[in-house]
Amino acid sequence: MTPEIKGADASVEVEVFLTNAAADQKLVYTVKDAEGKEVAKTETAAGETKAVLSIPAVHLWNGKKDPYLYTAEVALVSGEETVDAVSTRFGCRTFEIDPERGFILNGEEYPLRGVSRHQDRWGIGNALLPEHHREDIDLICELGATTIRLAHYQHDQYFYDLCDERGLVIWAEIPYISSHMPNGRENTISQMKELVVQNYNHPSIVVWGLSNEITMAGSSDEDLLENHRILNDMVHEMDHTRLTTIAVVSMCDIHDPYIQIPDVISYNHYFGWYGGDVSMNGPWMD
């Protein structure tokens, strides 16, 4: 689902991945609003796996203020029989990241204040139950957060759904962290593809994270640079609607070539924790 806002309306491109369709079958595309009312519908031959639907007077997904979601359904139809059908929720919104104004959601400044979240519990590990995910997001919202960095790996689909529903702005990333391994390139590529494909329809996600603190010394490793270029280019090819970022540590110079690869520069600072003191945060924030 790729929505594009056009004035008061939205044009939504839908791409379907289909195998083993018969020549006489067709695809029926339907969009329903949050109340279940049909707002757009079209159909194509089964061999045409892309369609564009128009949503008049579109209701925007507007973060915590109004996290409005539509539901799209695509049905494979043979005669009068529905052979198969899939559905997904999505939201329509615009965003940009401005160096002076910060994060802009639907044309308005939308300050981001948030946390990093690990999918982990004592005695449970990574195998969280739905109630644990709900408790996490309730605590995060209670803090007044507007954004979450989902560190540093793919999280449960249920939590991405909760983020869509609650209007959190999300940074999603792969587990490419701490040190670069030349023999791990194909793994990073595979995980990046999976992250984008599996989570493409979530309106809460605005940036894809390529790596986390992969070096403390900058870009002396050409293979590391090339790996990041490959990931960055691949993400932009797969998704032209979102931005890329990496998380770097304070010691890396902001002009380092490695830091300049993604769209957004993001720093992890630990002043007063691993080193220094909290007063050192001020100059960076200024």
Outline where the language-model segments fall:
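Short glycine/proline-centered loop/turn elements that form peptide/ligand docking sites
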Residues: 178-182
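Conserved beta-strand edge residues that scaffold enzyme active sites
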Residues: 154-155, 177, 249-251
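Secreted/periplasmic carbohydrate-active enzymes, especially glycoside hydrolases
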Residues: 1-154, 160-162, 166-170, 191-194, ...
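Active-site neighborhood of glycoside hydrolase catalytic domains
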Residues: 165, 183-274, 283-284
